[in-house]
UniProtKB/Swiss-Prot annotation:
One Gene Ontology term from the biological process aspect of the record: vesicle-mediated transport
Sequence ranges of Pro residues compositional bias: 460-471
Keywords: Autophagy, Endosome, Membrane, Protein transport, Transport, Vacuole
Protein name: Vacuolar fusion protein mon1
Biased composition (Low complexity): 10-20, 87-105, 450-459
Amino acid sequence: MDRDTEAGSNDGTNDNNDTTIPPHTPESNIEAVDHVPPVPRRPSPKLSDDGASGALHVAAASRPTTQVSTIDISTLSFPDGSRGTFSTSATSATSATSATRSVASPQSSASGYTSPRTDLVETVSVASYPATLRPPGDLADLVTGEFNRRSRAWSMLRTQSSSVQPFEASRTGACDSLTGFEKEFDNIPELGEKGITDEQRLSLWKSKMKHYMILSSAGKPIWSRHGDTSLINSYMGVVQTIISFYEGAKDPLLGFTAGNARFVISTQGPLYFVAISRLGESDAQLRSQLDALYMQILSTLTLPTLKNIFVHRPSTDLRKPLEGTESLLSSLADSFTKGSPSALLGALECLRLRKSHRATINNAFLKCRSDKLLYGLIVAGGKLVSVIRPRKHSLHPSDLQLIFNMLFESGGIRAGGGENWVPLCLPAFNNRGYLYMYVSFFDSVETAEENNSNNTNNPEQPPQPPPPKPVTSPDEEIAIILISADKESFFELKSMRDKLALQLAKNGSLALIQSAARQGRPRIETILNTKPLSKEAGQGQGQGQLSHFLYKSRANVQFCQSSLSPAFETSSPPLPSSSPSENGSSQKTTEKLVSRRRLMTLYHHLHASIHAKHSHLKVLHLVSEDAASLAWITPVFEFYCVAGPNMSSGIMTQCANKVVQWAKREEERLFIIGGGVF
């Protein structure tokens, strides 16, 4: 009873005791009455007597600490692409007015309590409404993210601007990362040669941007791209100690970084392969290069021979069994350092020919085929022209890479001239045994005489195409490669070669092959049907165009690329020399070398980014101060391209679509689909 009286005396107006206690219920009731007390009202703000200023003060005091500042932050896009942020003073008065209006007389709510007329106090910690949601012109709000909007004046100015070729800033800048790359392939002099000291030799060795080392698990040096044994012996010992330490802990060392150099280690049985690079390549790319060096060793020794050597004597010096093949290892390593699209994409490059012309060559190849033949290849300047193979058998690109390196990079076989009979292990085909390769280069003088004699002996025969011109470049050399499993088939394959050379000379195929090789790779402006970029500043096209591209057909494991001219055949101005005529050709070669490496470094970065382990990217667009680049991956093809830094993403995408459509139209000319099968 006392409790009921006490409850009834409560008038419900006290802010500190606003709850109502339910009355006592008799025990006869099964359940107690569940009366939910109302939520206490929020204290209403008390306005001061000083008008608007007091209202502003109370409004500011009542705001939660999580409120976003009401300062109007906007961005301005400048013509050079940069942006700046600033606060607009014109809207400060508006903000003040809105803040003044935010505090008004209270109004009653549905719950029976009073609350402010506006919802600002209730919702300010939940949402913020910036004043520049839809800015005009170059103004873009930070929240909307419209950073790429351009004014009409800027768009008109852009169409009149000259196209900038890729890497122009790097070519003239003092902080070029490839400074001194032209000396990368210079041999380190012997101790005492030209008065050079051991410290100078060590300095030259450390200045190299890329190193490859091969050593045995016992620490015996086998091969190194730079430096002789006396120079690198101690370093190989350190490398062997580090690798062995991690292997003893059952945690093999795969790679590490020291300064700006990346160390990647690959263990293949009793051999350790080490790559040291300052060229920005990924671990996967460096490891694939080390695998290629391992394949080169297997092509000389075969896997069973290599195992037997180290099973009986783990400390065997492998330099003696590999004697004479150092040039093959060096040329293969140098191709990686210069930048090899074939190694990067794991694909082959084919010579562009008409489908009918390639079919004619394949038919002539098959007609002259010997029973002892396993594979037959015609190669022009490192590009595959024709291949005949057994049904359901094909050569792996890594095996063909070893063959092309032997023929066109090392120069050993070409320097010998005439015909060559080479025992060779193709590891991807069979790493346990040898095949025998007959190699012969077509002599243009010989084929010209054959053409003339055929026309003289057969006056009724229709006139033949003009004979091939003398070879003036390694890219125009044509070689025939006949592979057999029979080591006694040299003369039979030689006879096949003679018949094939005569047949190709009669139908004019040799001239067509040499003409296609001399024509070179397709140019960008021809594919896009645009005007070529001028080398002089200010002469470029306003819309710009691609400078280079790589296109890989995944189904055919082949790729094509555009010509490096003109964007990547010029570099920094020529160095001053006392004899310009003597230094002209070497300077041009150096410029091409550095430009090619700069381009391939960007391609390596693109390839590594889009093929990252946990990446699911299909299209990647990168823009830097030097260049704009694009990578596009589908189940059918891989596409990579490079353009100048001022090229917009829209125009770059349009050009990429045109190139992809062109590649699909020209697929049977660009790639060998199937080849000759017997």
